[in-house]
Amino acid sequence: MRVTDFSFELPESLIAHYPMPERSSCRLLSLDGPTGALTHGTFTDLLDKLNPGDLLVFNNTRVIPARLFGRKASGGKIEVLVERMLDDKRILAHIRASKAPKPGAELLLGDDESINATMTARHGALFEVEFNDDRSVLDILNSIGHMPLPPYIDRPDEDADRELYQTVYSEKPGAVAAPTAGLHFDEPLLEKLRAKGVEMAFVTLHVGAGTFQPVRVDTIEDHIMHSEYAEVPQDVVDAVLAAKARGNRVIAVGTTSVRSLESAAQAAKNDLIEPFFDDTQIFIYPGFQYKVVDALVTNFHLPESTLIMLVSAFAGYQHTMNAYKAAVEEKYRFFSYGDAMFITYNPQAINERVGE
C-alpha cells in the first residue's frame, strides 16, 4: 500500500483555527460503514445514534503546556517541545535550535529565561532534559509553558486555548496534543447521554508530538509508528466485556481510544481484552483486524496521515475517501478544532484491496 493512496485535496480555508463557540455545536458527518451511506447533521445528533447500554470510551489525558522557549547559555535561541514527562525533574523533548545542544549544555527557559535546565542525554531525535529547580516539571510547565497547538493551526497560542484545547473530562496530565474528538462533548450533552442510559468508561493515552509527524516512507508497511503510553484499567475491561455480553456496542471517542482498546486486545492472553499499562506502537491500517471497537467518533484527519489510515481500516478505504470528498464539497471544518464524524464498523473493510 502506498502512502499517496491516502491523499486528498484540502483547501486551506477549511482548516479550523478556532473551535466553535459551543463545543457540541459543530457539524457531524455520519458514515455507515457497511453501506458507505452518509448523513449530514450536528454533533448533538449523537444522542439519537446511541442506544441505552452502549459504551462510550473516552481518553481522559490532559494536555500539558508543553512548548517552552528560551536559549542555550552559550547564546542560541531554542524551542523545546516536551514529548513526555519522565519524572518530577526530567523530560524527554524535541529541541529546535540552529545547532543541537550537546550533553551537559545549560538551557535558560521561559520568557524571562529564569528557569535553568541541563540537557543530559540524547536518544535519537529526542533530548533528555533535567530541570535545576525545586518545583516539579508540571509546576514549571504550568508556569512558563505554552499550549502546543498543532502546526496546521497557524497562530500563536492564546490564554483561552488552555481551556479550549482540553476535553471537559480531562484528568491525567501528560499529553502534548488533545484527543480532539472529545473536544465536542460538553457537560449538557454528557448528562443527556447518561440520562439515556449510555455507559461511559475512561482510558488514558498520553498523545505524543509524534502524532503530527508526517509518514516519511512511500510504502505504508515500512512506516515505524511512534510510541505512546496507554492505560486500560480493569474497570474499562469489565465495561467492554459487559457491553459485548449484552449485545451493545463499544464506541471509541477518538483514535487514541481506538489505539488504547485495540492495544489491550492485542496483548490479551486469555480474554477478548485485558488490562494494559504500557507503551504502544500499534499501527492500524487497511487489513487490520479490529477486535473491540464497533463505532467511532473522530475528527477529520490530515491527508496521508496514520489516522486517516486507521479510519480506512475501520470503515473501508473507498467509503472513507468518498466521505472525505463529500466533507470537502460540503465545506466541513477540518483537523483539531474542526467538525466530527460518527462511523460504524465495516466488517468487509479487512478484505478490501487498496491502490490496485
UniProtKB/Swiss-Prot annotation:
Instruction: Specify the protein name.
Output: S-adenosylmethionine:tRNA ribosyltransferase-isomerase
Protein family membership: Belongs to the QueA family.
Principal place of residence: cytoplasm
Q: Which Pfam families match?
A: Queuosine_synth
According to the UniProt entry, its GO molecular function terms are: S-adenosylmethionine:tRNA ribosyltransferase-isomerase activity
The annotated subunit structure for this chain is: Monomer.
The gene name on file is queA
The UniProt function text for this chain reads: Transfers and isomerizes the ribose moiety from AdoMet to the 7-aminomethyl group of 7-deazaguanine (preQ1-tRNA) to give epoxyqueuosine (oQ-tRNA).
Q: What are the record keywords, sorted?
A: Cytoplasm, Queuosine biosynthesis, S-adenosyl-L-methionine, Transferase
Is Cytoplasm among the key words of this record?
yes
- Gene3D superfamilies in UniProt: QueA-like
Catalytically driven reaction(s): 7-aminomethyl-7-carbaguanosine(34) in tRNA + S-adenosyl-L-methionine = epoxyqueuosine(34) in tRNA + adenine + L-methionine + 2 H(+)
Q: Tell me, what is an example of a GO biological process annotation in this record?
A: queuosine biosynthetic process
Species of origin reads: Escherichia coli (strain 55989 / EAEC)
**Any idea where this protein resides?**
Cytoplasm
* One GO cellular component, as annotated: cytoplasm
Q: Which residues cross the membrane?
A: none
